[in-house]
């Protein structure tokens, strides 16, 4: 809501709000780095939560409003694959799904002119893992962790590329090539 309070808008209401926030990382629970776990939750869950909170006054001021929150297929199934641990990401996306389902009832009872839904997209060919590494200052493609390489390998495999037997450095080079293009 601090964001909302600091902004000046040309209108006092909005009719639709899209909350789409995501960052890879956080990784495993067993050997987590707390700051990475927190950052994953801060973006993936709290990005959606604070988006709703910041713009709720403008939605309430409208004749009718709609909120669309983006979770992930990993908010249904907590797995990218058997060799990739991403507990923080899945937990955050489950939280978005649960928050949205609870918000639907909350709005129905307290603001029936505002509706809400959650979108659960499947794996989409983005560079979320790589972009996250760069945002966190972990370097480029050649510095990708084995977890990030496994994630990108699964993405390439899903796209139909025969990458199962490629060495990890070849996967890193493929990602680097995509970055440079």
Model-derived segments and their meaning:
Residues 2-4:
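Short, small-residue-biased leader/transition segments that mark boundaries at the very start
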Residues 20-25:
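Conserved NAD(P)H cofactor-binding loop of Rossmann-fold oxidoreductase domains
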Residues 28-29, 36-38:
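Substrate-binding pocket helix/loop in short-chain dehydrogenase/reductase
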Residues 52-53:
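A short, exposed helix-loop element centered on a Lys and neighboring polar residues
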Residues 72:
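Residue(s) in the substrate-gating loop at a strand-loop-helix junction
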Residues 78, 83-95, 99:
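The catalytic Tyr-X3-Lys active-site helix of short-chain dehydrogenase/reductase
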Residues 109-181:
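SDR active-site lid
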